[in-house]
Every structure is written in structure tokens, then in C-alpha cells.
Amino acid sequence: MIQEGTRTSADAVAALPRLTELLETATVAADRAHARYSGYQVGAAILDAWGVIHAGCNVESAAYAATICAERGAVAAAVAGGAGDLIAIVTVTRDLDPASCCGMCRQLLAEFGQELLIVNGSLTSDRLRWGTVADWLPNGFLAASLETAPLPAGPHAASAARD
């Protein structure tokens, strides 16, 4: 269930004891965002099972499809840094209402477990919204979906069966 509160609400702190540190790291990352086209700065901070925090920010490109969201940047930094299991990700924007992760980021976060905690925060207010990947992406397309997928029908079905 997706919950709402503030940076100091007991529920938020109980859900993620290092919340303040993660919010600070995400804020620094947001300030470093390369958002020259939209001006929309997003920062992210991931906590791994070893207690290491990995940061990411959005990086925009004139070729819009090449833009990298802060969440995907943080995941890439965590994986490249040899992270343990991912425990939580905190994102921040300057919106009054916390902005949620886009669908592509939710899908990528699902690769790291349905219980991964996602916390979205506002730098303009102290509002937060949080829940697990399963809350944010119900019935997501997961690795198990590939294991049960039927073979394709059509002209290439025979070659797919041989591969």
C-alpha cells in the first residue's frame, strides 16, 4: 500500500531508518542534474544491503530518448559499484507534490525485488510518498514472466524452438 507522510513522520522513519541521509544524498544529486532542456532536476539515492549509498541524477540529451532518469542512473552506479542487494531508493524533485518514478524506472527497479522500498520526496515541501515495488508496479513484467511465455507462433517459431 502506498503511504503518505512527511520527512519526520514516524511511519516514514520506521519504514527507512536512514531516510534523512538518503534524502540529503538525493538532494545533492538533484543539484548536479544535467537538465538543460526541461530544468526539471531529479536526484536519487539507493541504499544497498551493505549500508552503502549510491547516487544518481537525471541527465538530459538533445536526443530526448537518450535521456537517463535519476533512478536508472542510481541503479547503474550501484551495480557498477558492486552493490549488495538493493534495499531502498529515495528520489527528490522540486515539485510540491512528490513525483513518482516513471514506468520505465519502476520496471527496472522490479529487477531488484518486489520488496525494494521506493520513497518519493519533495524539496519544496516536506511531503513524502512511499511503498514497495509491488505497490508501485502491481502485476509487473518480471523474470518469471519470461519463463512461462509460450513460444511465438508464425514464420520464425521453428527457429525460436531450436535456439
What kind of feature is each model-predicted range?
Residues A26, G43-A44, G56, A74, ...:
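Small residues (Ala/Gly/Ser/Thr
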Residues G39-D48:
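Short beta-strand scaffold segments in enzyme catalytic cores
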